[in-house]
Amino acid sequence: MFFSTNELQHKDTLAIGLFQKSQLSGKAKEMDELLEGRITELLKEGDISSKRNQLSKFFPSPETGIKRIYFVGLGKESDYTFEEAKEGFAHLFRKLHQDKKQAVSVLLDTFIGKDLPAQDAAHTLSESCLLATYELQDFKHKTNEPDRFIEFVYAMTDHDTTEIQASLKVGEVYGQSVNSARTLVNMPPNMLTSSDLASYAAELAYKYEFEIEILDKEQMEELGMGGILAVNRGSTEPPKLIVLKYQGKEEWTDVIGLVGKGITYDTGGYSLKPRASMIGMKTDMGGSASVLGAMEIIGELRPEQNVIAVIASTDNMISADAMKPDDVIVSLSGKTIEVLNTDAEGRLVLADGVTYAKQHGASVLIDVATLTGGVIVALGNETTGVMTNNDELYAQFKEASEECGEMIWQLPITEKDKKRVRNSKMADLNNSPGRDGHAIMAGAFIGEFAENTPWVHLDIAGTATTEKPSCFGPTGATGVMVRSLATFVERFEGKK
């Protein structure tokens, strides 16, 4: 789909980036000369714009052999970064998709800035193309014409085409993997059960030669996974603990544990959600989708790291045998938990998932979950809440998230917070100390199972979905943290 070339391969549709500056330069200047100064004229007359994210279209004279040119405003070069480039490309490809263009030649060198080298621009191009042209998979009876997608993108450059092609490939892998996660999260809950999620993971394992283990209910009972089993009690769908192992080193050391919450539907259980809050709870497996998306990138790019991915999956339903407030359960770790809120179920399955990852060699842990409404109140829908017990590990993850443009913000876990989750007359822990500090209480609870293992907790409740369409696609799932997790794995520095 993406091709690097030193020559103009497709003249029907061209795309050129324009910085706000007094004079054109580089490839933009060369194209202006080919068009006998028309770009300069159009800029002066205001018919095309170099302001950031402004798109303009121009139809040259037939003798040039070029049918149409899309101009992408990039703003001031001094303000131009990876994120600005990503938005510019996204606006371009979304417009091309809407115009049903199937091929385009992009003058890549016009999108290069002093802080954005050619390889980064190429990565951004392919990643943004796939994110921007993603369409929600629906189940309507279609009678309209079939969708037409962009099939050929030629990145024309004076740089080494082999290096540019490699960067295009990495960006393509990142974009496709994010879209895979989006599709999982958008699926209706009757079409994505825990068994379906396990089947999807098995397909990944087969494709990328991961070691895979899928624990069923009987195996969980033998091991004593009281957290997952308690949440599953109200369901007719069997639970699954999905384990993928990728070994990129000779020895199984410095193992990164990725743990995803896989609640395929959440009614709240007997602590029942109101109707309005229940709609959309198919997305409560967003953490598992982020982990699987990251594993797709890992499988494609094969970093020299060791990774164990653990997904604890069930739905949270109601029946005569369902988990009740006041129940006391025994987790895989042996710690007992007093259930004060059956709608605080995600932390129960994560407790067993985290413990299982530790038991199977994880030396550091990152858990990902659509866990609390509290994090949305605190941070909104653009920033993922983060908690940790290890500043060095957090710093490594923060660097990865910044590189990917995914905003995070650290919330504290104090000794008083830990005391609140340990406050129970009946058990070692309680699963819901109260509404105040809700997001922190959830993180503190999971931290009781991470114990001394370096650990980062990502609460993506606010960022896993969006209600506003953007240049990066429609409403629905965002695939948040897929790129950050994969980048963290690639850059991870273990014990020194």
From Swiss-Prot:
Localisation: Cytoplasm
Cofactors, names only: Mn(2+)
Catalytic residue positions: 273, 347
Binding site for Mn(2+) 1: 266, 343, 345
Annotated InterPro entries: Leucine_aapep/pepB (IPR011356), Macro_dom-like (IPR043472), Peptidase_M17_C (IPR000819), Peptidase_M17_leu_NH2_pept (IPR023042), Peptidase_M17_N (IPR008283)
Annotated S-S bridges: none
Enzyme class: hydrolase
Catalytic activity: Release of an N-terminal amino acid, Xaa-|-Yaa-, in which Xaa is preferably Leu, but may be other amino acids including Pro although not Arg or Lys, and Yaa may be Pro. Amino acid amides and methyl esters are also readily hydrolyzed, but rates on arylamides are exceedingly low; Release of an N-terminal amino acid, preferentially leucine, but not glutamic or aspartic acids
Keyword rRNA processing applies: no
Major localisation: cytoplasm
Keywords, ordered alphabetically: Aminopeptidase, Cytoplasm, Hydrolase, Manganese, Metal-binding, Protease
Cofactor binding comment, as recorded: Binds 2 manganese ions per subunit.
CDD domains, sorted: Peptidase_M17 (cd00433)
Residues noted as binding Mn(2+) 2 in the record, renumbered to the chain: 261, 266, 284, 345
Pfam families in UniProt: Peptidase_M17, Peptidase_M17_N
One of the GO BP terms on file: proteolysis
Name recorded for this polypeptide: Probable cytosol aminopeptidase
Species of the source: Bacillus pumilus (strain SAFR-032)
Record gene name: pepA
